[in-house]
From Swiss-Prot:
Belongs to the XseA family. It is found in: Cytoplasm. Heterooligomer composed of large and small subunits. It catalyses: Exonucleolytic cleavage in either 5'- to 3'- or 3'- to 5'-direction to yield nucleoside 5'-phosphates. It comes from the Bacteria. GO terms for biological process: DNA catabolic process. Its EC number is 3.1.11.6. This is Exodeoxyribonuclease 7 large subunit. It comes from Serratia proteamaculans (strain 568). Its main location: cytoplasm. The gene is xseA. Bidirectionally degrades single-stranded DNA into large acid-insoluble oligonucleotides, which are then degraded further into small acid-soluble oligonucleotides.
Amino acid sequence: MSLPVSPSIFTVSRLNQTVRQLLEMEMGQIWLSAEISNFSQPSSGHWYFTLKDDRAQVRCAMFRNTNRRTTFRPQNGQQVLVRASITLYEPRGDYQLIAESMQPAGDGLLQQQFDQLKQRLSAEGLFDQQFKQPLPSPAKRVGVITSASGAALHDVLQVLQRRDPSLPIIIYPTSVQGAEAPLQIVRAIETANRRDECDVLIVGRGGGSLEDLWSFNDERVARAIFASRIPIVSAVGHETDVTIADFVADLRAPTPSAAAELVSRNQLELLRQLQSQQQRMEMAMDYYLAQRQQQFTRINHRLQQQHPHLRLARQQTLLFKLQRRLEDGMQNQLRLSSRRSERAQQRLAQMQPQARIHRYQQRVQQQEYRLQQALERQLNAWRQRFGVACSQLEAVSPLATLARGYSVTQTPRGELLKTTKQAQVGELLKTRLQDGWVESEVKTITLAKKPRKKRAAE
């Protein structure tokens, strides 16, 4: 049975052609928000992928000459905004989209803007290490730029109160989220630099989404941080959150609490250091006294082994010098200890640990008194031992024998004259008396008569 030819009867190819023309003329170009899936890039360089939402999907192509202008590479699961034309592929009767442009949507767009700004500022040198300022150690006053009602400020204040309650804090309240937040943060940084009230700044906020933290990815904030004369610690969000402010700041802290730890001193650690220094000082003083005592013992031993008065006098002079140096050294050590104690008291006074200072001061005074008493006892003992040594030397000295009326005579040859056989008439003899020397000439030599021994009775 043959069918009549009528204009209302289409062939398949004509139908597909008509539908394609209708779609292209009626729809034109549209903007589509969707998720990418089934992304592929064959050797031709064209992109083929599917755009979908939770209820439908459509095929899409983006030709090589067009996708070259795209600033990112699409990934499966990424949300995008696509400007495309609707067409129909006539051989299969499938309609599809031909993409003309594509950009990330939502967080994807923000991430693209983040990467572009990061690359540009890095090229300008704003992230270079040579521009990083060192943090003051210790900080004398800390400035905090954050929301006055946020959890970040509460965390910072709590940490500073625990670690260093005497550290002054200046708060520069500002918005940290919203369209006005970047400008307010910039003004707070400029105000802190103009007033010059603190020597380190903490700039940050608590955690949140990428959009919540976006104020700290603003170029104006980055340049204000870079221009700050006061060192800045960035403390934005949690440890996994990274912002442009973190790259520009002089130091990045993973959280606001960690930033407070970095800029503050540990009061307990200072007390431990003071105790350690006191122990080292006491050990040094004990070592110094032991060395001086050993030195005195060696000198005293040498004096006991040497008999002549001249050497004894030299050793006595040296002993006096050493005694003076010992006394001066101890006085210097005591003065140095006193100055260290005064400096420690001043530092502790600023932190108001009055009770511990009073106890340590009493201990230092007790140690000083004990040291002086020990030194005086030791010096008195040394003086007594020295006097005994001098008395012993005087007792065995030849000069003591001469003082009792005896004399010593020498021949011209330097021999001690003991018998008449050593002397000759006309020789000059030299006689040592208590108070000097006498020279005499031998006139005659007379032998002393030996006493006769009585014969034994027969």
